[in-house]
């Protein structure tokens, strides 16, 4: 181990009409051993999507930022929390101003590997509704799996989208944690092209390129906060059960009641705001 080294995140852009509103594509370029799946195929996927967008003549509304992250696998010595360092530093140190400007981080991990019986987009709660609508309207894509693509949530701590999300950037990743590869080849010298699946790789190119186009057409960032509120409410119910067992429920009852009222108020306001924005946008579209 060589201490006190410097690594670099590598950033490129496809300028959009609105430079202060961005969609981020991210993947890490460091790896254990050769890292064919984890994560060189993901970096190549970003470049492939970017090239396709440029070659098509597409002029985005949002600036598309492509970021190859360093130090995802390992970036801190003498720590149990040594991964996703490059992404953490990118959003907390190098570009904290991205929070509020990046409307979505599309992170990529092991995208040329078949995971289970279907592709999944693992997303933060706020994007689940939009992604489900997006998947419902998709044209026929490469048939890489026997089952249709699905959305799952929440995101997990395994990958760089988590570092982005805890900073306030709504994030998602192609779900990559299923399958025997994770038990036999992951983070080892056996991560080579043996498990390369061209159909899965094509599907992920198509799926996320079209998602970029769908996000680019939104006048309002399509975040839905109801799932977050519902998860908080569920957590409070679980907390109540623990409190009853610990015989402290009475002490926390009033605080919980006030918190639940605020949560319900937040849910109502967020739903109303999103609905109003969509109605106004549709009215403008109809007028034009």
State the predicted function of each range.
Residues 194-284:
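Charged, amphipathic alpha-helical linkers/stalks
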Residues 31-126:
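Acidic/histidine-rich catalytic neighborhood of metal-dependent amide-processing enzymes
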Residues 17-21, 52-62, 93-101, 137-142, ...:
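Secondary-structure transition/capping motifs at alpha-helix termini
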Residues 10-13, 22-26, 65-68, 103-107, ...:
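Structural recognition of the beta-strand scaffold that forms the well-ordered cores
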Residues 1-37, 47-58:
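Soluble metallo-hydrolase cores and metallopeptidase-like ectodomains found primarily
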Residues 286-288:
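Phosphate/adenylate-binding glycine loop and adjacent helical scaffold
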Residues 1, 5, 102-103, 110-230, ...:
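Active-site-adjacent substrate-binding region
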Residues 15-19, 29-31, 71-73, 110-113, ...:
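Short, glycine-/Ser/Thr-/acidic-enriched flexible segments
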